[in-house]
């Protein structure tokens, strides 16, 4: 990374390394306070989420250098995993203002969810992600398919939208989310709204049908998927369930308040800067 930056003429960048993504916000906030106008993030979706949470609504631009298992935000924005190309985009590409979602006071850029998806991510852990990669998601999903559904009530922009048994609820800011599936094909990260999907599938057969539709980018045609969009969501569960933000595990809750911050963060993307 240092060598690539040096070849681009950046010889002495301010440099921070952190052992875990949760340690990054403190360093990021210090860099922003010191006047950094461009911040390179070399890491996975968890690192990117933590840093966006710290940088959003400031004037600092983020350049993503993907180095995780899924790299979902980078994939949705067309940012390559090749370090040299990603750095070039950061220095010479255009800037795109993205919306961010906010769940229970914490920002996310790709997705947030509670239920089966969060159980999968919890069981994956950093160790399995590193060893098994995407196959780890398959293992974690199969392990949790027998998990009992829970009662959920959802309001979208203040209106009653869903009430019933569900396996998970997902909120998306982009189209391709968990496991690289296109669950929200209509989603755009700069359209001023979020997508929400409730999955009612239970058991292997139901999930096979649901995932089959998702692979074909037609999840809304599944009888086990309910999809809507809006600016605010109020999600209430009958008991505490684990939840996740951009693939990062969070402590179990039973109520989730979700909103959107439009055009909250600038991200470097492909194309020459104007």
Predicted segments, located by residue:
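ATP/NTP phosphate-donor binding region
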Residues: 1-39, 49, 267, 274
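Catalytic core of DAGKc-family lipid kinases
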Residues: 7-8, 18, 56-61, 65-168
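Short glycine/serine/threonine-rich phosphate/pyrophosphate-binding segments
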Residues: 24, 46-51, 70-72
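N-terminal glycine-rich "phosphate-gripper" loop used for MgATP/nucleotide binding
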Residues: 41-45
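Glycine-rich phosphate/pyrophosphate-binding beta-alpha loops
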Residues: 113, 117, 170-185, 249
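ATP/nucleoside-binding phosphotransfer catalytic cores, i.e., glycine-rich phosphate-binding loops
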Residues: 156-158, 188, 198-274
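Active-site loop ensemble at the mouth of alpha/beta enzyme cores that anchors a bound cofactor
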Residues: 185-191
């Amino acid at each position: 990374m240092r060598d690539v930056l040096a070849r681009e003429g950046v010889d002495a960048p301010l440099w921070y390394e952190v052992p875990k993504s949760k340690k990054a916000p403190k360093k990021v906030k210090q860099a922003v306070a010191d006047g950094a106008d461009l911040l390179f993030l070399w890491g996975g979706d968890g690192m990117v989420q933590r840093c966006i949470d710290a940088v959003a609504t400031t004037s600092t631009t983020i350049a993503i250098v993907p180095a995780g298992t899924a790299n979902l935000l980078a994939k949705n924005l067309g940012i390559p995993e090749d370090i040299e190309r990603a750095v070039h985009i950061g220095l010479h590409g255009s800037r795109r203002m993205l919306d961010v979602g906010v769940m229970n006071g914490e920002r996310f850029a790709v997705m947030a969810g509670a239920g089966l998806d969060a159980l999968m991510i919890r069981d994956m852990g950093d160790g399995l992600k590193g060893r098994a990669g995407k196959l780890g998601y398959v293992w974690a999903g199969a392990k949790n398919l027998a998990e009992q559904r829970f009662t959920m009530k959802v309001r979208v922009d203040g209106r009653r939208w869903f009430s019933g048994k569900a396996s998970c609820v997902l909120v998306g800011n982009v189209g391709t989310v968990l496991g690289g599936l296109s669950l929200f094909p209509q989603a755009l990260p700069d359209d001023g709204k979020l997508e929400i999907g409730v999955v009612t599938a239970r058991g292997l057969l139901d999930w096979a049908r649901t995932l089959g539709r998702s692979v074909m980018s037609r999840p809304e045609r599944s009888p086990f998927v309910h999809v809507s969009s809006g600016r605010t969501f109020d999600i209430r569960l009958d008991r505490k369930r684990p939840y996740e933000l951009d693939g990062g595990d969070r402590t179990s809750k039973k109520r989730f308040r979700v909103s959107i911050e439009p055009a909250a963060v600038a991200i470097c993307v492909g194309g020459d800067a104007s």
